[in-house]
UniProtKB/Swiss-Prot annotation:
Job of this protein: The MdtABC tripartite complex confers resistance against novobiocin and deoxycholate.
Protein name: Multidrug resistance protein MdtA
Keyword Zinc-finger part of the UniProt annotation: no
Superkingdom classification of source: Bacteria
Species name: Escherichia coli O139:H28 (strain E24377A / ETEC)
MF annotations from Gene Ontology: efflux transmembrane transporter activity
Compositionally biased tracts (Basic and acidic residues): 399-415
Gene that specifies this protein: mdtA
Signal peptide: 1-21
Keyword Transferase: no
Amino acid sequence: MKGSYKSRWVIVIVVVIAAIAAFWFWQGRNDSQSAAPGATKQAQQSPAGGRRGMRSGPLAPVQAATAVEQAVPRYLTGLGTITAANTVTVRSRVDGQLMALHFQEGQQVKAGDLLAEIDPSQFKVALAQAQGQLAKDKATLANARRDLARYQQLAKTNLVSRQELDAQQALVSETEGTIKADEASVASAQLQLDWSRITAPVDGRVGLKQVDVGNQISSGDTTGIVVITQTHPIDLVFTLPESDIATVVQAQKAGKPLVVEAWDRTNSKKLSEGTLLSLDNQIDATTGTIKVKARFNNQDDALFPNQFVNARMLVDTEQNAVVIPTAALQMGNEGHFVWVLNSENKVSKHLVTPGIQDSQKVVIRAGISAGDRVVTDGIDRLTEGAKVEVVEAQSTTTSEEKATSREYAKKGARS
């Protein structure tokens, strides 16, 4: 009994599910049949069906900018390192105990400033000894000269032999030689005493002290007492591709100093401006580059030895150049081109010859003129002769474009 009772319930459930499925199927079919005639009727009432209906839709939105005429600087760029104009390790030239340091670590010093003192006692004693010996020998020389004068008078009356006269003359000459040696000894002792006062050999900034007061130092110490780096002026050494050498040489022949700018590691902040000093005399065969040195006054201490910077050197300025945003320049099978807008906002493809460019602007040497409007965004939707809707059109007469132009003129571009 229980088995037949369960079977009946299973049959009832299956029948209910089948009924629900049939109802949903019938309802969906009626909806599709009622929608089809309305859609067909709407298509028939439309003035232009199919593709013509699509063409009557909204115009493709694009952004545009106006080509402008301006002076464009040309820069050569490279990576470089700041180096001190001079780097000197200050060492003692005499042996002795370090008595005093007369500088603060990091301060600027001038050539001749006193930096340190070595105990001068032994050098003063040596000087006094040399001076005493000199005085003694000078007295001996004076006495020998007086004797020589008497011998010369006596020789005239044959009271002194010629041999005695010659011997006295030789004694005078010998003593004169001794005097010269004594004078050299005095000068040497004086020099040793002077060297006990250690002075700055060049202008520059002193580093950290390498030895403390009280230590015994030697003239043979390679570490030295302190290192001085000359930072006013300071140099920048950077590299350029060998292909840029001719451009630099030609710019140098113009007779004007070439301006070199130092920018920070991120190339977003200008640190200082200097001038080209020289090119190296050979190309690095491994990298195909040449080293270039520029010099900066660095009075504001914006540059520091061993600092990494981006270098930019102005080599030329292209006057009356036609400039457009780089985003407008496209590349196709026929070469570079831009989409130009006419007065009716219809676009046409113009082949162009680009010149100097960077990430923001590009110089167009042929193909368009100043005042032409070019498409900068929405280019992928364009076809020849299509009419478009210009949205947020950019013009160089706006304050935003003027700011961009000033920034471009300041930074320039690399060819």
